[in-house]
Amino acid sequence: MSSYNVGILGATGAVGQQMLECLQERDFPVADLRLFASARSAGKTVEFKGEKVVIEEATPQCFKGCDIVLGAAGDDIAKELLPHAVEAGATVIDNSHAFRMDGDVPLVVPEINGDDVKWNKGIIANPNCATIIGLVPTWPLHQVAGVQRMIVSTYQAASGAGVPGMRELEAQIAAMGKGEPMPEPSAFAAQLASNLIPQIGGFKYEGFTSEEMKLQNEGRKIMHLPELRVNCTCVRVPVLRSHSESITLEFERDITLEQAREVLASAPGVKLVDDRDAADAHDRFPMPIDTSDQDLIWVGRMRRDISNSNVSRGITFWCCGDQIRKGAATNAVQIAQLLVK
């Protein structure tokens, strides 16, 4: 088997660190690993497969010799540096928003549109975490009945804002437990502990936030459904890890609840956890505490959409997934695996 020189831009962040773990867990054929981060992190070491890897400063010239570069940096750094990686001969798989809606850049979820990697021109984009978590179970149902509309509410963990988000929530919880003054929020617009924040991203179209519009815009591109209609509300919740979503789908063809369950029970990347009707049911359904640090999207609470005038064409379900793994790092490594297949 061939092996590849792999670089990670943003190697010290939450997603970059998870990419390292995923490369190792999936036994990706790495010949030489290069880690790029800010000048502040340069010179530090990270362990990979029992060896110490020195972090290099990320510069336009740093990518020479890389075959694949995984991007885990913010939009501005991605726009500034990753085109230089392509010029140096690497194929880039980027987790930022910078290139997602570029017409020349495939936006890929391997379980859905893995073949799109074939038309890449040097950059492949990783979708937004909430998009991935919602679409992995939606896609197999679409293949059976044809999705026309999605109504989605997301419940997004603090770690969706990276390490600072997690640290801020932990500090607030600790202060509450000790009866101390609440630390001033900085990662979020308001206190998150014992609270919900119904805004993620800036306001864009018709009062929807940038995060809410991503699911429609990215979903249309990934599923090749330019007319897909999505109504999404995104909420930040006081959970450390794993996003949850309530999704109602409207179909163009009839689908029974039993059919939908059968489809999801065998769908790639999905785990059906919906034991309400089982003889030994314990009312166990997907929860973020169970889906953290693993790669499957758990689906449950499946039921008909009784608000639909044709109840045979509406399904509602609840899903949870680790947004750092499948919602970011794992999805990127899966794309890399498609490239070297």
Task: Locate each region found by the language model.
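N-terminal Rossmann-like NAD(P) cofactor-binding subdomain of oxidoreductases
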Residues: 1-192, 227-229, 257, 262, ...
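Glycine-rich beta-alpha junction loops
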Residues: 39-41, 129-130, 154-161, 196-204, ...
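Oxyanion-binding "anion nests"
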Residues: 193-240
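A short beta-alpha structural unit
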Residues: 233-250, 284-289
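Glycine-rich phosphate/pyrophosphate-binding beta-alpha loops
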Residues: 235-238, 321-326
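A common structural junction motif
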Residues: 259, 264-274
